[in-house]
Amino acid sequence: MDPVLFSIDERGVATITLNRPQQLNAINMAMRDLLWEYFRACDEIAEVRAIVFRGDGRAFCAGADISEFGTAPSLMDSRAARHDRDLWWELLNHRCLTIALMHGFCYGAGLELPLCCDLRI
């Protein structure tokens, strides 16, 4: 199962779905990489006018996946990765309208993502 789903409809609305419902959509490194790819794709595809974020299951996003904390990169590597691929900066400065459809748990990164969006529902 893909941890993040991506689609674009005929109206130019991209939907990015956090798809780890058993883990309450906690964001792991694979999801972070996919979110970056999909943000960039939405920026490059001229037909995309809006991006809607949603979470599958009973939570929007419970934050970072703490099961990966023990295998996390060093502090310097983490800072470099955040600088090179800053998801929140990309979202705050995206050319498209961004909307978070929030429900259930929204903690940590699961609250940061909606706060970076233009609209929260």
Model regions: which residues?
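Short secondary-structure boundary/capping segments
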Residues: 5-7, 89-92
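Glycine- (often His-adjacent) and acidic-residue-rich active-site loop
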Residues: 47, 55-90, 106
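Conserved CoA-thioester-binding segment of acyl-CoA-metabolizing enzymes
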Residues: 1-56
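Hydrophobic/aromatic residues within transmembrane alpha-helices
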Residues: 16, 53, 65, 113-115
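Glycine-rich beta-to-alpha active-site loop
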Residues: 90-121
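Conserved phosphate-binding and hydrolysis motifs of nucleotide-dependent enzymes
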Residues: 19, 25, 57, 63, ...
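Hydrophobic alpha-helical membrane-association signature
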Residues: 31-34, 83, 113
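Phosphate-coordinating loops and pocket residues in cytosolic domains that bind phosphorylated ligands
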Residues: 26-29, 62, 71, 116
